[in-house]
Amino acid sequence: MTNIGGPVVENASIEHPVISEEEGAAAFARVMAQLKAQVGIEAYTSWFGRLKLAEYSRNLVKLSVPTAFLRSWINNHYGSLLTNLWKQENSAILRVEVIVRGMKRVSKGVVCRTSAAPVVLEGQTASSFVESYTEPSVKDIEAGVFGSPLDSRYTFESFVEGSSNRVALAAARSIAEGHKSALRFNPLFIHASVGLGKTHLLQAVAAAALKRLMPARVIYLTAEYFMWRFATAIRDNAALSFKEQLRDIDLLIIDDMQFLQGKSIQNEFCHLLNMLLDSAKQVVVAADRPPAELESLDLRVRSRLQGGVALEIEVPDYEMRLKMLRQRLKVVQQDDNMVVISDEVLQYIAKTVLGSGRDIEGAFNQLLFRQSFESDLSLERIDELLGHLTRSGESKRIRIEEIQRAVARHYNVSKQDLLSNRRTRTVVKPRQVAMYLAKMLTPRSLPEIGRRFGGRDHTTVLHAVRKIEDLVCDDQTLAKELELLKRLIGEQAA
């Protein structure tokens, strides 16, 4: 028997007669009580709150969680503990396995997704089991995605629509539904700060495309996973096969494009991108900034990405934040109808937590956790608990790109004007104001700011900063403009 922080496996060929549902539920409750006592309520709520019993036999226990990340974390950090607790409950147990809900095991398929197993092509026999993304409504589709795992929660149905993401959502739906008009904005490039729904939207496209395309040739990858797979293929002398698999697809979805590094890898990606686009195959890409600002990317890649349509997802407004909270509560109440949070409290959170969807989710989870042992939470207590996420909390880090966008909007010029060599007064003043604010509001050095403004020298930035400092002493209109811009930028970064 071997156990290194993960599930125990002993003699997988042994029969596993299934125990009754009532016995299983009782055993699961006892083991979970023991687990909570050993790890503490906070760790239990964080890591095991969504754990469910999927199967219980004489020798085997299968537990399910909603995400691959949660499965990996539990296996790596609590695998031995879980196995020992189940053995204490039933000494005949040989294996405790954690699986992801909504996935099934297959031995062959068209293209299957896996984080470690090899790609399986139609007609081949898998050398080991791999996981294929499925949902009950599409469980008979023998298709899938190889690459980064899909989270079954990330669908169009669960995506909260609002004014800040409506255009990006419409474009994503058009691609997922296979509209011919979608090729007019190919590639589709979605950019936003962290926690605003880029990954959710991209995975929703992949999930919907898998339902529609039979067989599906869909690949969803993070940029980091693409780099790892490519490096592994080179190491194993399988680079040619890897490239062929990537080229024989209908839809390529790349997340976190800002992390694509390395000259040779970027060169390969450029060839892949050119080939797919020239073949009228759809490409969807997401990053934390527009293509022109991905300075680490090869110029050819940036140019090709700019040839499609770039859409920004912005910070959610009050109505959208409230909608997200109401939907989150509805989902929780489906599992536990005893959970009650008043709409007044949800409205209060939506008004005070001004950040990303991830901040909203964090605020809701914090409230849900606290409510389990503080039944009557006042608004003052909620303020105290969520202080790190509200207006009174620490301000978020401001990016130069956010300053450039705000200044460009205010002075009715384009961002490209700010980066250009144009010397007209209508452009010079906004450019100097933006450089000044970049120096005041960010920790960036003068050379770095200069690079972000079209590759200018640091002395140009220094001149702009001093110029604005001199003007603001005598120009009350400019002083008010600067205060307004600081407030707008602060709200945008909140």
UniProtKB/Swiss-Prot annotation:
Span list, region Domain IV, binds dsDNA: 372-494
Pfam families recorded: Bac_DnaA (PF00308), Bac_DnaA_C (PF08299), DnaA_N (PF11638)
Binding positions for ATP per the UniProt entry: 195, 197-199
Region ranges (Domain I, interacts with DnaA modulators): 1-103
CDD domains found in the cross-reference section: Bac_DnaA_C
Region (Domain II): 103-148
Function: Plays an essential role in the initiation and regulation of chromosomal replication. ATP-DnaA binds to the origin of replication (oriC) to initiate formation of the DNA replication initiation complex once per cell cycle. Binds the DnaA box (a 9 base pair repeat at the origin) and separates the double-stranded (ds)DNA. Forms a right-handed helical filament on oriC DNA; dsDNA binds to the exterior of the filament while single-stranded (ss)DNA is stabiized in the filament's interior.
Record text on subunit structure and interactions: Oligomerizes as a right-handed, spiral filament on DNA at oriC.
Protein name in the entry: Chromosomal replication initiator protein DnaA
Organism: Bartonella quintana (strain Toulouse)
